[in-house]
């Protein structure tokens, strides 16, 4: 060894070069005023003495790290790491190692003190070649680097130029925190070491693949870096707090890291051959001491099984094995929840010997207890919260789960079976614990609520009620029961909307419109629409609808006007009308007749019609001219079904077409008429008017000896002039003037003013010829009463007005016209407010003199071939359920001019029969909806 000379030489001697293992003469110089501190080596000492040029000069100021290297097969190696690469010296003994290493570090510190540089104290430095794989090429970290490990980070320092041959930039130096490394491993045959970085690393998430000089270096890198990641040194434990400017709390353990890798990210050679023999490794670094850092495995987590924990082994404190138990105050049963290695797996790595993944291993030589005895409990994974936050395990048993052990009662009173586990009995019905008393809900009510028959209808599951809920529900149903008391045997019912139970659904109005007899002087709008009987038109057992939604206040629902916006149908059956005495006739009729009655529409007050009855026969009988049905209706209440023609469906055995009857009215009263003039402005050809003389008119009228029992069909141009003399004596007459009314079946009628009503229908051209032949047979029938035939048509009619000039001209010709198609009778009953009054002849009345009757009959006009201008048919968008107001004699108390309705395509035919006394009806649709505009009643 050469002595220290005046030029600053400190040490010299023969040592081996690590790369070639050849002996070289090394000379160490300190810093002088002339030269810097440096390390030189020569081939031989002779060349050094001859002042030959050294083989290599390494300046200590360029070395960022000088330390001992333990990853080689040589025991005493010192490595000087610089940007030009690493240089290793193999010494002969430990003493030589200590002497040279201490002198090198002393010179380095002196340089750092002089220049103000700070050198990092790297524990391990490996020279690696980062392959162009994974994320390396993207981030620009490829080529030869120094991999420097410290207690908190892993630093890569570039070796060589900062640009590649292709001109790409290289990262000169970068530091990666150990906490951002997800996992690491090595592959021995290929001398490959790799590691996966997380998203929080400075390079982002990805993998780095590095090639080492030999497989031993790759293995050493894996073990050393994994030990550093798992170490529990003070600097590493509180690394996150220090970096985030938080206080250094050394007694708090670091949080376990979560697994973020999957099997697909592992290399193929690493995944293979996972089952190998157990291998225990010793610590390879003197700096690996202390407790290992708690960290979760890098691979995807899964819940371990009991078989895995049963295969765990005991390991002494002298083995550097990674502990996966939770430290602190948590019990040791809260062990690692995933990926515990089995007995036959290598403990140095969860992977094979050739591919060792950092799962459950550590190079720490620290002492820790036997944690592997029961690393997997049967209670599943334990959360990382403190024990104070854990749920109470009062009902958890150590044995296997059972139905009673794992059940936590939810009853207000804890059953005795949970207080005494040995006595497990089912509660008895008389158990006092089951007697739950609640205010306003007695136990009897609760017992009645649990009725299986009421809830188990149609095989449905039993509904669960809250305490006392069903009791109030049943009370509400009882209070509302009379609103919907039909269909008591329904199994499943549909629900009403909120507040709709008190009203009849509109669909019921479209199917059938019925009102019960007013026998008890109650409001008809409150009666049920479904009544048992052959005329009901609907099913007799209608299902009661449930009220699933909360109903509105009962006070608002049950009122007298809850159906005021709907139609009104009033059919009552009354007793026979008592005849008027002469005093009553004079007081009610004669004294109130206006003087000028020609320009005023006749009005009448409505008599009591509470006992009126309607009877109907089929429409076929009307067309065929059959006899009228004079028997009383078999229905209980005398209902008349109002229904659209043709399209609506009826489930009643008595269908609508069978109920389209002809109307027969029998008037038992005889009307003393002094003079009756019928003014009409029908478009009758002039030649027919000339043929009809007053003599012929009187002859034809005398042949009609039946009782006047027809409805007077007054058009707008037909003004009724009745001059009644109060002083005319009252006469008795047994004669009955029968006027047989035929049907006006012409589509071209011409109507005049709007003073009276006429029920107008038109007939299509296809049916006209058939009906015309049937009417001839109908005229031959000398039956009492009159008929109103309604025929559905394809178009509607509209009235047209005629000027005053035509009206005056028609008044002069009114006595010359008699038709065979229309027979008119008085339309209004005697009234105190009428401007024109008509009277029927009856058996029980005193009749006026014969000349009065003759004068009356002379003025009754029967028109033929009425031609009205047809109006366009109704729009197709109008509904087929029509509303109308039909005022018959002795029934109306309204001015018909107020109820002018427009015709539509179809209208429900109406028919009545005459029985005892005057039988009339009132069909009132005054307050119907917009569809009421399609009525068939015209104000003529």
From Swiss-Prot:
Task: List the SMART domains.
Answer: IRS (SM01244), PH (SM00233), PTBI (SM00310)
Would I find Phosphoprotein among this entry's keywords?
yes
Kindly state one GO CC term assigned in the UniProt record: cell cortex
Residues annotated as coiled-coil are none
Q: Which Gene Ontology biological process is one annotated for this entry? A: positive regulation of phosphatidylinositol 3-kinase/protein kinase B signal transduction
Do you know which InterPro entries this protein is assigned to?
IRS, IRS_PTB, PH-like_dom_sf, PH_domain
Q: A Pfam family this protein belongs to?
A: IRS
The membrane-spanning stretches of this chain are none
Q: Which residues carry this modification: Phosphoserine?
A: 284-285, 340, 548, 904, 907
Q: Domain named PH: which ranges?
A: 8-109
Molecular function terms, GO-annotated: insulin receptor binding; insulin-like growth factor receptor binding; phosphatidylinositol 3-kinase binding
According to the UniProt record, where is the region Disordered? 523-549, 895-915
Where on this chain is YXXM motif 2 (motif)?
639-642
Q: Which residues carry this modification: Phosphotyrosine?
A: 407, 883, 920
What keywords sit in the KW lines? Differentiation, Growth regulation, Oogenesis, Phosphoprotein, Repeat
Residues covered by the IRS-type PTB domain: 122-236
Q: Give me the stretches of Polar residues compositional bias.
A: 523-540
Q: Where is this motif: YXXM motif 1?
A: 407-410
According to its UniProt entry, what is the function of this protein?
A: Activates phosphatidylinositol 3-kinase when bound to the regulatory p85 subunit. May mediate the control of various cellular processes by insulin-like peptides. When phosphorylated by the insulin receptor binds specifically to various cellular proteins containing SH2 domains. Involved in control of cell proliferation, cell size, and body and organ growth throughout development. Also has a role in a signaling pathway controlling the physiological response required to endure periods of low nutrient conditions.
Q: How does it assemble?
A: Bindings to phosphatidylinositol 3-kinase and SHP2.
**What protein is this chain from?**
Insulin receptor substrate 1
Q: Which organism is it from?
A: Drosophila ananassae
């Amino acid at each position: 060894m050469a002595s220290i000379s005046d030029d600053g030489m400190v040490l010299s001697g023969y040592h081996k070069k690590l790369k070639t293992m050849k002996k070289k003469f090394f000379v160490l110089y300190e810093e002088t005023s002339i030269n810097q501190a440096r390390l030189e080596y020569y081939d031989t000492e002779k060349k050094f003495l001859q002042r030959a040029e050294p083989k290599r000069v390494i300046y200590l100021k360029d070395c960022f790290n000088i330390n001992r290297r333990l990853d080689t097969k040589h025991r005493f190696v010192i490595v000087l790491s610089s940007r030009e690469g690493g240089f290793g010296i193999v010494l002969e003994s430990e003493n030589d190692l200590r002497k040279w290493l201490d002198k090198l570090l002393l010179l380095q510190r002196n340089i750092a003190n002089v220049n103000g540089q700070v050198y990092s104290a790297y524990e391990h430095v490996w020279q690696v070649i980062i392959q162009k794989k994974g994320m390396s090429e993207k981030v620009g970290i490829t080529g030869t680097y120094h991999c420097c490990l410290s207690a908190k980070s892993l630093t890569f320092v570039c070796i060589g130029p900062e640009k590649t041959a292709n001109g790409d930039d290289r990262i000169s130096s970068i530091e990666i925190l150990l906490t951002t490394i997800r996992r690491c491993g090595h592959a021995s045959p290929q001398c490959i070491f790799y590691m996966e970085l997380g998203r929080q690393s400075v390079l982002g998430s990805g993998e780095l693949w590095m090639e080492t000089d030999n497989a031993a270096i790759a293995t050493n890198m894996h073990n050393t870096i994994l030990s550093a990641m798992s170490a529990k040194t003070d600097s590493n434990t509180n690394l996150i707090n220090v970096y985030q400017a938080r206080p250094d709390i050394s007694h708090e353990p670091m949080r376990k890291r979560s697994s973020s890798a999957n099997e697909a990210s592992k290399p193929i050679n690493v995944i293979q051959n996972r089952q190998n023999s157990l291998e225990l490794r010793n610590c390879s670094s003197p700096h690996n001491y202390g407790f290992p850092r708690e960290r979760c495995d890098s691979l995807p987590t899964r819940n371990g099984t009991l078989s895995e924990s049963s295969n765990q082994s005991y390991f002494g404190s002298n083995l550097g094995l990674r502990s996966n138990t939770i430290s602190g105050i948590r019990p040791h049963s809260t062990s690692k929840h995933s990926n515990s290695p089995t007995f036959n797996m290598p403990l140095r790595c969860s992977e094979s010997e050739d591919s060792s993944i950092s799962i459950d291993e550590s190079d720490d030589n620290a002492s820790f207890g036997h944690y592997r005895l029961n690393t997997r409990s049967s209670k599943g994974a334990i959360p990382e919260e403190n024990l104070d936050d854990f749920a109470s395990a009062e009902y958890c048993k150590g044995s296997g789960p059972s139905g009673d052990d794992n059940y936590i009662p939810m009853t207000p009173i804890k059953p005795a079976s949970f207080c005494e586990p040995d006595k497990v009995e089912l509660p008895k019905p008389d158990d006092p614990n089951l007697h739950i008393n609640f205010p306003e809900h007695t136990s009897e009510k609760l017992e009645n609520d649990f009725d299986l028959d009421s809830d188990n209808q149609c095989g449905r599951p039993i509904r669960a009620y809250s305490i006392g809920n069903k009791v109030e529900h049943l009370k509400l149903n009882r209070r509302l029961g009379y609103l919907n008391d039909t269909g008591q045997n329904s199994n499943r019912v549909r629900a009403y909307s909120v507040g709709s139970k008190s009203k009849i659904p509109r669909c019921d109005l479209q199917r059938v419109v019925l009102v019960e007899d007013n026998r008890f002087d109650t409001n008809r709008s409150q009666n049920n629409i479904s009544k048992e009987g052959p005329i009901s038109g609907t099913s007799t057992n209608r299902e009661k609808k449930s009220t699933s939604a909360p109903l509105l206040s009962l006070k608002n629902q049950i009122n007298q006007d809850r159906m005021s916006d709907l139609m009104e149908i009033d059919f009552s059956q009354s007793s026979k009308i008592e005849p008027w005495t002469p005093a009553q006739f004079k007081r009610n009729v004669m004294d109130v007749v206006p003087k000028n009655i020609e320009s005023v529409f006749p009005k009448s007050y409505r008599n009591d019609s509470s006992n009126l009855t309607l009877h109907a026969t089929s429409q076929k009988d009307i067309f065929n001219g059959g006899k009228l049905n004079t028997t009383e209706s078999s229905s209980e209440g005398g209902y008349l079904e109002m229904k659209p023609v043709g399209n609506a469906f009826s489930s009643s055995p008595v269908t609508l077409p069978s109920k389209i009857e002809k109307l027969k009215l029998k008037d038992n009263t005889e009307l003393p008429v002094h003079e009756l003039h019928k003014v009409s402005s029908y478009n009758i050809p002039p030649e027919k008017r000339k043929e009809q003389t007053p003599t012929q008119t009187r002859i034809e009228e005398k042949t009609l000896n039946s009782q006047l029992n027809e409805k007077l069909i007054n058009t707008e141009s037909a003004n009724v002039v009745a001059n009644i003399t109060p002083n005319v004596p009252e006469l008795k007459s047994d004669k009955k003037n029968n006027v047989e009314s035929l049907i006006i079946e012409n589509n071209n009628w011409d109507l005049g003013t709007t003073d009276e009503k006429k029920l107008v229908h038109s007939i299509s051209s296809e049916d006209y010829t058939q009906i015309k032949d049937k009417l001839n047979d109908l005229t031959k029938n000398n039956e009492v009463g009159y008929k109103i035939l309604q025929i559905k048509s394809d178009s509607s009619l509209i009235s047209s007005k005629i000027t005053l000039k035509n009206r005056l001209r028609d008044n002069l010709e009114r006595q010359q016209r008699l038709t065979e198609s229309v027979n008119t009778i008085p339309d209004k009953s005697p009234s105190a407010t009428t401007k024109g009054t008509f009277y029927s002849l009856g058996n029980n009345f005193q009749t006026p003199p014969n000349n009065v009757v003759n004068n009356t009959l002379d003025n009754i006009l029967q028109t033929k071939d009425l031609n009205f201008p047809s109006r366009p048919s109704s729009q197709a968008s109008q509904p087929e359920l029509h509303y109308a107001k039909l005022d018959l004699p002795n029934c109306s108390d309204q001015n018909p001019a107020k109820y002018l309705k427009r015709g539509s395509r179809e209208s429900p035919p109406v028919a009545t029969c005459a029985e005892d006394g005057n039988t009339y009806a009132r069909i009132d649709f005054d307050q119907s909806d917009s569809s009421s505009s399609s009525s068939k009643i015209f104000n003529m």
